[in-house]
C-alpha cells in the first residue's frame, strides 16, 4: 500500500481573504502545474512497488474521475513509467469516484498479482465548498499472494440508484444535491454493507481495531463513523489534505496500514453511490513496510497562494510568458523512445561501464555499436553539481530552475527541478526523479522526468 500527497498546500483561510467568502480551516493538497492524475498515479505506484521488491504485476488498473485523456487508455502511460512487463494488462477504470474502491475490490476478488492505482484532481467553483474541501493525490495497492502486509479477510458492497453528485461531459466542476439528502441515504447503506462484510469475514464488530470512513458527503461520513460505536475511527485527512475522491479510500487505507500493529483488524468503509466495506488483518510484515509514509508527506509541504492555485486550475488566465510556446510532442518519436521518455532508462556500455543519458547506440569511450545494457535510472538518486535559474525560458510558473545532476554510480544529466523555489536549491543537494508533464499542446501531454529535492530525513 502507498499514498502520494503533492508537495503544495492551500491554506483554506486564504480563499476568504481574497474573495470575501468561502474557505475554512486547515489546508488542502494541490497538485503542481506539471502534475495530472497520470503522474500522481505513477508516483503512488512507484512507492507501492518500492515496498515490494521483485513484484511483477500481471495487471494494472488505473481509476480516476479526472483522466488526462478520453478515448485513449491512460493506464498505458502508468504502465510504461513503472516499467511493467509488456504482457501485463493495463486498463482504465474511470469516470466515477466509486471506481477507486471498485477496482481495489475487483483485484482482491481476483487471482494473480494486480497493481491498483488511483488518483484525482479535485476543485470547484471559486469560493465553493467543493473547492475548499477537495484535495489532490494518489494511492496504490499491490494485491497478490505471498508475503503480505495486510491479509484480506472479506468485504461486501451495497448499490443503490440515487443522484447526489454529478458532472456532465464537458463540465469543469461537479454539482451536488442538498447535503441532507445524501446524509439520509448513505448511513443505512453503510450499515447493510458493514453487517454483510463482517458476516463474510466471520467476524464480530468488536474484533475490528480501526476503521477509515470515506465519503464525498462529510455529514454522511460523520453519521456512519458514529454508528460504528466503539471502533477507533482514523483521521480522514480532511483537515490537512482534503478529499481526494477516487484516490481517497486507498489513501486512507494506506494511512491506516502504516500505523497498524500486527494482528489488528482494519476496516475500510466507502460511501459513494452505495457502500463498500473491506476488512483486513495487519500481518507481521506491516511494521516499517512503508517507503514514504503518508504522514511524512503531509508534514513535508509548502504553502501556495490562492492566486497561483486559481491560475494552475485554469480559473483565471494570466498574461503568458512573452516566449514561443513549445511545439506539439511527436507521438511517433515518443513511441520510438518510450523506454527513455516514460521509464527514464539510459544505456550502459558493457565494455567500459560508461552510462549514457539519454541512451546511445555507440559508446563515447570506444567505437563499439549496440553493445549496451539497459540502465533504469528513475529510482537512482543524484546530487546537484550546479544549477541555474532561468527567467527567460517559457514556463507557466516561472522561473525555471535547471540543475546538472550527478547520479549515484555514474552518469550526468541536465534536468529541470520541480516542487521548489530558487531559494530552496543549493549545490550538493540530493534529488530524486519524478514523473511530470512538460507541457500540453493540441491535447497531447508531453510526459517526462524532472528532479525534486529529497525530503529531509530520506
Segments the model singles out, each with a brief description of its role:
Residues 1-37, 128-184, 188, 261, ...:
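Condensing-enzyme catalytic core mediating Claisen C-C bond formation in acyl metabolism
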Residues 38, 42, 67-68, 85-87, ...:
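Claisen-condensing/thiolase-fold acyl-transfer catalytic domains that form or cleave C-C bonds
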Residues 44-58, 191-209, 228-229, 414:
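Phosphate/pyrophosphate-binding loops at sites that engage ATP/ADP/AMP, CoA/4′-phosphopantetheine
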Residues 323-381:
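Cys/His-rich short segments
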Residues 392-404, 445-448:
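Short aromatic-glycine-enriched beta-strand elements
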Residues 419-433:
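Short nucleic-acid-contacting surface segments enriched for D/E, G, S/T with interspersed K/R
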Residues 434-458:
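OB-fold/S1-family single-stranded nucleic acid-binding modules
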Amino acid at each position: 500500500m502507498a499514498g502520494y500527497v503533492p508537495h503544495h498546500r492551500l491554506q483554506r483561510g486564504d480563499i476568504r481573504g481574497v474573495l470575501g467568502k468561502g474557505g475554512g480551516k486547515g489546508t488542502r493538497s494541490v497538485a503542481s502545474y506539471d502534475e495530472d492524475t497520470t503522474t500522481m498515479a505513477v508516483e503512488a505506484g512507484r512507492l507501492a512497488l518500492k515496498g515490494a521488491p521483485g513484484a511483477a504485476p500481471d495487471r494494472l488498473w488505473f481509476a480516476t474521475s479526472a483522466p488526462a485523456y478520453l478515448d485513449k487508455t491512460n493506464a498505458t502511460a502508468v504502465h510504461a513509467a513503472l516499467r511493467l512487463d509488456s504482457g501485463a494488462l493495463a486498463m482504465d477504470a474511470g469516470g466515477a469516484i466509486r471506481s477507486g474502491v471498485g477496482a481495489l475490490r475487483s483485484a482482491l476478488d481476483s487471482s494473480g498479482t494486480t497493481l491498483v492505482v488511483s488518483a484525482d484532481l479535485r476543485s470547484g467553483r471559486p469560493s465553493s465548498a467543493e473547492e475548499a474541501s477537495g484535495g489532490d493525490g494518489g494511492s496504490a495497492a499491490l494485491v497478490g499472494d505471498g508475503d503480505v502486509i495486510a491479509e484480506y479477510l472479506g468485504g461486501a458492497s451495497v448499490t443503490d440508484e440515487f443522484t447526489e453528485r454529478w458532472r456532465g461531459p464537458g463540465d469543469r466542476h461537479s454539482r451536488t444535491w442538498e447535503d441532507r439528502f445524501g446524509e439520509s441515504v448513505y448511513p443505512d447503506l453503510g450499515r447493510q454493507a458493514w453487517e454483510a462484510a463482517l458476516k463474510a469475514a466471520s467476524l464480530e464488530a468488536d474484533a475490528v481495531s480501526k476503521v477509515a470512513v470515506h465519503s464525498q458527503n462529510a455529514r454522511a461520513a460523520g453519521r456512519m463513523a458514529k454508528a460504528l460505536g466503539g471502533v477507533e475511527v482514523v483521521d480522514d485527512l480532511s483537515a490537512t489534505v482534503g478529499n481526494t475522491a477516487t484516490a481517497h479510500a486507498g489513501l486512507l487505507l494506506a494511512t491506516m496500514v502504516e500505523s497498524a500493529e500486527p494482528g489488528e483488524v482494519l476496516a475500510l468503509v466507502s460511501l459513494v453511490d452505495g457502500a463498500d466495506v473491506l476488512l483486513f488483518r495487519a500481518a507481521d510484515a506491516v511494521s516499517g513496510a512503508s517507503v514514504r509514509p503518508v504522514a511524512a508527506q503531509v508534514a513535508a509541504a509548502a504553502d501556495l497562494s490562492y492566486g497561483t492555485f486559481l491560475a494552475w486550475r485554469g480559473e483565471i488566465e494570466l498574461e503568458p510568458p512573452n516566449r514561443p510556446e513549445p511545439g506539439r510532442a511527436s507521438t511517433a518519436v515518443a513511441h520510438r523512445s518510450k523506454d527513455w521518455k516514460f521509464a527514464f532508462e539510459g544505456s550502459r556500455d558493457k565494455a567500459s561501464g560508461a552510462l549514457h543519458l539519454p541512451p546511445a547506440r555507440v559508446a563515447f569511450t570506444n567505437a563499439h555499436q549496440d553493445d549496451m545494457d539497459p540502465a533504469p535510472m528513475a529510482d537512482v538518486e543524484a546530487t546537484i553539481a550546479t544549477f541555474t535559474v532561468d527567467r527567460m525560458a517559457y514556463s507557466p510558473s516561472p522561473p525555471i530552475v535547471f540543475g546538472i545532476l550527478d547520479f549515484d554510480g555514474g552518469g550526468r544529466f541536465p534536468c529541470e527541478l520541480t516542487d521548489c523555489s530558487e531559494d530552496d536549491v543549493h549545490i550538493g543537494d540530493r534529488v530524486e526523479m519524478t514523473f511530470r508533464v512538460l507541457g500540453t499542446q493540441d491535447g497531447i501531454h508531453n510526459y517526462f522526468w524532472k528532479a525534486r529535492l529529497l525530503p529531509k530525513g530520506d
